[in-house]
Amino acid sequence: MKDLGVGIVGCGVISTIYMQNLASFRGVRLAACADILEAPARTQADKFGVRALSIDALLRDPEVEVVVNLTTPNAHFEVSHSALTAGKHVFSEKPLCVTVEDGHRLVHEANRRGLRLGCAPDTFLGAGGRLAREIVDGGKVGSILAGSCSLMSRGMEHWHPNPGFFFQRGGGPILDMGPYYLAALCNLLGPVESVQAKTSIGYAERLVTAEGPNKGSRIAVETPTTIMALVRFVSGADIVLTMSWDVWKHGHSPIELYGTNGSLRVPDPNFFGGTVEVTERSEDWQLLDTSTRPYGKPNWRSPIWPASAPDRANYRCLGIADLASSVLNGTPHRSTAAFAAHVLEVMNAMLQAGADGGTVRIASRIERPAPLSDDEAATYWGGQAA
């Protein structure tokens, strides 16, 4: 099987798991990396045995066929657009970009040039997301009527060495973490029809306590840090969504869906595995372990946590492998830019509804991605058992 050369632009914290995982996926090969700053690019290049280039040089490099855009959100549009105009396929970290208009421009540019444009999250393609999709599609819980979705924490300044961008326009919990939850929901339920929301800024300033050169500095918060939304799907399902970086502790499940025949709990959509829980009518919850399915086995533990055995399934790059397979085999890929642009429109609609009040209608419509079977998923992996 031919490998596509991959160039990574953006060598920050998230780049390590991408560079580490790329070596285990079939159809892709890490060729080079670049960053607006030379030092982080050189550090990652030396660590993973690839070339460190300038961004312009990477975009011109004939060995690079797929550009993976890991820059900060406010640079996503410029880097992805430049890569497309250079004739490269692109896979971007979430969000696709900051504005809905720029998202549509990227989708149009990729389509016009016949290039593949993908976007994280790809976590819904993991073992937990696939099993949840099987349960919903199989009708085990009936038609989904309602649900809840929660991401709440103290924020990013306690662990990230350079957290300023999280609190600028294009950041906040909805644009940073919302894509995981909304992509998981759209994969299960289809497109969103409308949103209502309330938003607030819990703290006007954030004190950086993470180790690093910014420790002790203060960040002025420019974007809402709590979003509470009612999301109406075209299917008729209503989901209550809460995203907040103003919460010390809570007890909510990441995603719960309530159907006509039962209920479903979907594991943390920031990762690829976890335990899916399902109940039929008033029966007890059934706990369904996904660790024996492709991309369900724990392989990672956060470096900021005390050392211990891996406890999370973190197979970032699965969407890149799916995109590469689509290029090599002429098949559709799943984490598409159109899908990500719909999610982006929904997130921006929440911010608009929070600022203006009322209901914001979603203009775009998307099809759910084709289900990824365990057998097909396994063909993407070339490393140790996933």
Regions found by a protein language model. Name each.
Residues 66, 72-73, 77-124, 139:
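Beta-strand-loop-alpha-helix segment that lines the small-molecule cofactor/substrate pocket
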Residues 115, 142-146, 352-386:
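C-terminal capping/lid region of NAD(P)-dependent oxidoreductase domains
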Residues 123-220, 357:
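Predominantly a Rossmann-like dinucleotide-binding segment in NAD(P)-dependent oxidoreductases
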Residues 204, 208-222, 228, 233, ...:
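C-terminal glycine/acidic-rich active-site capping loop/insertion
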